[in-house]
Structures are given as C-alpha cells and as structure tokens.
C-alpha cells in the first residue's frame, strides 16, 4: 500500500464572525493532519467581494491562533488565484467541458416559474448546451454569457463519506453548474475544485451543509482528470435551543468567549467533544486529542451546544492550571478592573488561592479585587453589626497568636485552633468577624490561606483597627 501524505484544509468565507461551530470545522481537519503528520492549510474563500474584508480574515486567524491551531500553509486567498481560475475556465471551454450560456436572469426566472407551476423541481433546461446535431439559438447582442460546466447526463455520483457512509446522487438532479459569472468572476464550487486539486488536498472535513455541493465538485474534478479527496461531512452544531448555531440565532463569537474569561484549551476540549468521542474521556489535553483523533470516531447525529458543560470544563481547566500561567492569563482581566497586580500581595499567590472556586478568569479577577483594595474604613455601626463585642477579646488574642505563628497555612490554622480552644468558640464565630475586619465582607476563601497571601503585617494592621 502506498503511503499517502495527508493534506487537509479549513476554507472559511470571511464574514467577520466566527462561532464555535465554525471553529470545530477548523479543529477536526487540523487534528487529523497533526495525527497523521500531514499538512493543514488555511484557505480564505473570498470571491464574495461584498462580504470579504481583511478585518474579517483577521478575526478567523485570531480565533485559530488563540486555540493553537497552527498552519503549515496559508492563509491562501482565492482572489489572488483569479488568473489560475480563468486559465482553467479557458481550458474547459477549449476542450468542450464547459460552454457559454446567454440565458438572461429574466429568462431563468421565467423558466423557474413555469417549472414550479408544473410542480417540477426548478432546473436549467440546457438551452445553450451544445450537443451533436443540436442547433443553438442565435447569440443575442450585448449579452455577456455565464460559463456552465457540461455535467454528465445519466448515471450517478457515488462517494463513501467518512461520516455519513455511501451517498449516491443522480446526475439528473444536477444542473450544468455555472462556473464563471457574466463578469468573469469564478463561482464558489468551481474555485473549491481547482484549489483542492492544486493544493493536493487528500481529505475534506467540513460541515454537512456542503453535502449538496459534493457531487458537483466531484464531477468537475473527475472531468479535469483529478482524483476526489476523502469527504467527511460533520453533523450540524445546534445551539442550546436546538436551532442551527449561527450569529442570527444568538451564537457567541469566539472573541466573546475570550472576553468572558474562557481558556483556549478548555474551548478546544469542548469543541473536540462536539461530534467526536474517545470512550468516556471528558477532560483531555490537546496532545491527547491529537493522539486519539480519527475519522471513524466522528458522530453522525447533530451535536448540541451545552453552555453549562462548557463552563464546567473551563472550571476544570482553571482548577488544574499552573498558577504562574493562570496568573498571566488573568492579568488583563485584573487590569481592566483597575487592579495594580505589581503592588500589593503576590498576584500568583492570589490566583492560586482563588482558582479552585472560579469558573472563568473574570471570576478570578473579581475575587482578586479584595486583596488590592485599600484597608476598609469601617464605621462604628458596621463594626457593631458584624463584629460582636463578645468576640473582641478573642480577636485580641488572635492578633498575638498570629504574630508569633509560622507564616504558613498550617501555622495560621494552629493559631486559630489555639484561640478557639482558649475562648471556647466555634470556627465561624471567629472566622466571620476576622473576614469582615480584613475585607468588609464575610465571603472569602479559607481564612488561613487568606492570611498567607495577604501577609501577616497587613492582616494585623487591619485587625488592630477594630479591636482598639
């Protein structure tokens, strides 16, 4: 058996918006290429000049870079290959694989209306298709023709889809496809074929909204002497309401998830499971995913977006992240809240303290605010309502115990234990007033850990203000 060098591609149209379903269409071909030590190519299908902008392309590249989907080639822009498409159109005209069609838009619309009135499926009737012995209509003056591919008549297009199994489409269902518009610009399905052939794409892994394009592309490719790639059409990604995921249906963009404090590895893990599985594995690294990925494990049923599952996964990744790396990822969110991470407690320690309870980087940054706020200026009323007079003697003894304790979690825990026993108190009766004295709130992580991060001197200074 000959060795096949795997080459896959992600070929989006740049619309300026990329959601999770779009990115999944990039992730799977990337993973397949990486698993097989092949090549992954980014191709920008920008022949729709009205919708395509460089800013829109940048959004795609930014999302892929954030997820770590590295490229071997690209981005390759279709509009930069226009001369190549024109060259192939001319070859097809010269060889009889294509022909000019002078049918106007009005004539096509009239034909479509007549067919629908007769309960027929709308289709091009082959008026300008050259056949032996057929007399073509006179060429109208001043009309620029479209160029149509001369599709096979009779028979079927059959391919074995890596996800959907064998698919067969009758050629009678397929029109003579327009491959170049009257202004000379090539059409989507034609460009795709030439690109896939020129770039030697071996596997086309894409959404199942492209299934209807596949027989047309196969016929053009075979007519040009090419070998069709392996096709794998991924089932649709549905939103949490069961509708197809789209901007129109309220899908969040990848940028939105970035801004909401999701980690790229959590998003990648989540996307991997939207239509693919490896046993019962729920949480896995990018490296494990690449090692396990194969087309045989792709699901056939639509995958439904589950925001709660994504948030849970993000929590798992935050919880298991290296504190140094997590602190770096959190800094932009902290700075946006006005936190100066360079002054005050060690930010890595603060993040390490907060990460086990946080679902997003924003939640970590919100929690970190406590440690960088000025010393609370508590009123007498606040002190009376939150720090009972009966606890003041215990707080005084706690200050002494903290002063002589080892500055560790264990040391401070021992100091609390000593004072609790001395005053016959339960932990909440002492810990809650301490929290309030330190932060003007009773909602904090474990108090012994808080003291380590805050530092002994700052903690004693704040406690002393309420026990004078």
Swiss-Prot record:
It is an enzyme of class 6 (ligase). One of its GO terms (cellular component) is cytosol. Its EC number is 6.1.1.17. It comes from the Bacteria. A motif ('KMSKS' region) lies at residues 244-248. Keywords: Aminoacyl-tRNA synthetase, ATP-binding, Cytoplasm, Ligase, Nucleotide-binding, Protein biosynthesis. Catalyzes the attachment of glutamate to tRNA(Glu) in a two-step reaction: glutamate is first activated by ATP to form Glu-AMP and then transferred to the acceptor end of tRNA(Glu). This is Glutamate--tRNA ligase. It comes from Polynucleobacter necessarius subsp. necessarius (strain STIR1). The lineage of its organism: Bacteria, Pseudomonadati, Pseudomonadota, Betaproteobacteria, Burkholderiales. The gene is gltX.
């Amino acid at each position: 058996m000959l060795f096949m060098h795997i080459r896959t591609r992600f070929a989006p149209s740049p619309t300026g918006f990329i959601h999770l379903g779009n990115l999944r269409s990039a992730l799977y071909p990337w993973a397949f290429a990486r698993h097989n030590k092949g090549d992954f190519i980014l191709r920008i299908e920008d022949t729709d000049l009205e919708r395509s902008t460089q800013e829109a392309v940048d959004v795609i590249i930014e999302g892929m870079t954030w997820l770590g989907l590295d490229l071997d080639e690209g981005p390759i822009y279709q509009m930069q290959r226009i001369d190549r498409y024109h060259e192939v159109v001319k070859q097809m005209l010269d060889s009889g694989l294509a022909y000019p069609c002078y049918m106007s838009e009005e004539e096509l619309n009239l034909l479509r209306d007549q067919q629908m009135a007769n309960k027929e499926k709308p289709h091009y009737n082959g008026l300008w298709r050259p056949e032996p012995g057929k007399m073509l209509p006179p060429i109208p003056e001043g009309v620029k023709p479209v160029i149509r591919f001369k599709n096979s008549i009779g028979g079927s297009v059959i391919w074995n889809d890596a996800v959907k199994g064998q698919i067969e489409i009758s050629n009678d269902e397929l029109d003579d496809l327009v491959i170049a518009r009257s202004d000379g610009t090539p059409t989507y399905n034609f460009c795709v074929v030439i690109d896939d052939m020129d770039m030697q794409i071996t596997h086309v892994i894409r959404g199942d909204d492209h299934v209807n394009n596949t027989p047309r592309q196969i016929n053009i490719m075979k007519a040009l002497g090419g070998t069709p790639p392996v096709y794998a059409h991924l089932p649709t990604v549905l939103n949490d309401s069961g509708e197809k995921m789209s901007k129109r249906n309220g899908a969040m963009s990848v940028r939105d998830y970035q801004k909401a404090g999701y980690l790229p590895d959590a998003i990648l893990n989540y996307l991997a499971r939207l239509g693919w599985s490896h046993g019962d594995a729920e949480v896995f690294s990018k490296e494990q995913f690449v090692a396990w990925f194969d087309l045989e494990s792709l699901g056939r049923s639509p995958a439904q977006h589950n925001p709660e599952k994504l948030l849970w996964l993000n929590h798992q990744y935050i919880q298991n992240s290296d504190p140094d790396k997590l602190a770096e990822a959190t800094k932009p969110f902290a700075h946006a809240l006005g936190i100066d991470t360079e002054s005050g407690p060690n930010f890595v320690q603060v993040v390490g303290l907060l990460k086990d309870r946080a679902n997003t980087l924003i939640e970590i940054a919100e929690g970190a605010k406590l440690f960088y706020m000025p010393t609370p200026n508590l009123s007498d009323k606040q002190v009376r309502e939150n720090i009972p007079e009966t606890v003041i003697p215990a707080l005084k003894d706690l200050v002494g115990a903290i002063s002589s304790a080892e500055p560790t979690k264990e040391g401070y825990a021992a100091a609390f234990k000593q004072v609790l026993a001395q005053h016959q108190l339960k932990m909440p009766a002492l810990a809650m007033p301490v929290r309030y004295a330190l932060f003007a709130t009773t909602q904090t992580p474990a108090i012994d850990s808080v003291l380590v991060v805050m530092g002994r001197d700052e903690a004693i200074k704040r406690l002393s203000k309420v026990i004078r």
